[in-house]
Amino acid sequence: MEEHYYVSIDIGSSSVKTIVGEKFHNGINVIGTGQTYTSGIKNGLIDDFDIARQAIKDTIKKASIASGVDIKDVFLKLPIIGTEVYDESNEIEFYEDTEIDGTHIESVLEGIRDKNDVPETEVINVFPIRFVVDKDNEVSDPKELIARHSLKVDAGVIAIQKSILINMIKCVEACGVDVLDVYSDAYNYGFILTPTEKELGACVIDIGEDLTQVAFYERGELVDAESIEMAGRDITDDIAQGLNTTYDTAEKVKHQYGHAFYDSASDQDVFSVDQVDSDEHVQYTQKDLSDFIEQRVEDIFFEVFDVLQELGLTKVNGGFVVTGGSANLLGVKELLQDMVSEKVRIHTPSQMGIRKPEFSSAISTISSSIAFDELLDYVTISYQDNEEFEEEVIETDKDTETKSSGFDWFKRKSNKKENDEVAPEAPREESYEDRENHLEDEQQTEGKAKEESKFKKLMKSLFE
């Protein structure tokens, strides 16, 4: 069985994370990770290019060693900053009976990219909401259907400021890897929700170091997404000021004794901290600490509620899903549940090695990559049962179950080309299976050329 790897990079404000994974039945098997803490990122953006580049390079190396994979190509997640979310439609026509395949789907989606009229932005994700075959046949996946006249798509679109996109890609590719594609967290978050949550209307709250990102899904699709410049760093600042100690000490205390729900915090758990303006050590209880934490986390949630109100939402029937590094704090779920009547849960990836909320974005980037590979029908994987990995698998939505792998597809096509140059086969009569395989190879080669040229075209357009 050939190996098909996906590599995702999550450039966060406090650390850079890399995950190497593979599609395994209905889930993802993580085979290697890397994480490097850095000061080169601020508010989700590159603040110091050299420091950020070194952190990215280090985490790629760690993931490569852990997985045994020579990482050459990656999928990059992008934050919800300078981002626009809107709906668009496009249609392509046929002049004879045509069996729809991945190339037709790619063509109708690419046409939406060309319609972007938001100044200084680049469309990074176009995700289909529904397809319509021959004007009146609405389907979720048109592949293998026969169209006589047309294929239309109604899609959601995510666009981001070009400067943000190009600087992130430039920094990653300066580490000696190629960015195959990028996925916004706004789209990625759909893969941490259950189908029921997405249908009823659910709000994802990702509390990171500098940013809290909010995405709302309803009727199975992304409605909108925003970011709030208030997050874990603000919690630590409040602790440092309230306890009259240094930021580093406040950060350690937060992780060791922090509790976001005052009513559940302990007044028996005692710790001491150094003071900034003296040599004195002052003792505090977890309840004292919780007083500062709860106020700030409440403020973050109130900001989230403001975002939802701006969207005209008064009810979140599918509930709230909290994730990100600051979701590790005890009491976060209890505090939010005390503030709302809807269901609240903390999302933590269940794969071995990444069972922390801060890995949600990186692993869901792989889910996004797999979903688009299936949609565009890039490559077919023959699965084999292997019970040894069952504990490391997280179930993904059945809607996004796939048999494709973008990363290895590029690797396979490259190897095939090299082999063809060395030992071309003599002409022979093709069987039906041969013709099918040949057609598939041509489609894959065409797709590869489009993918490889995407960001080169972007680079060129920035200077026109």
Curated annotation (Swiss-Prot):
Residues 416-455 have a biased composition (Basic and acidic residues). Keywords: Cell cycle, Cell division, Cell membrane, Membrane. It comes from the Bacteria. Residues 392-464 are annotated as: Disordered. One of its GO terms (cellular component) is cytoplasmic side of plasma membrane. InterPro entries: ATPase_NBD (IPR043129), Cell_div_FtsA (IPR020823), FtsA/MreB (IPR050696), SHS2_FtsA (IPR003494). SUPFAM superfamilies: Actin-like ATPase domain (SSF53067). Signal peptide: none annotated. It is a peripheral membrane protein. Cell division protein that is involved in the assembly of the Z ring. May serve as a membrane anchor for the Z ring. Belongs to the FtsA/MreB family. Self-interacts. Interacts with FtsZ. This is Cell division protein FtsA. The lineage of its organism: Bacteria, Bacillati, Bacillota, Bacilli, Bacillales.
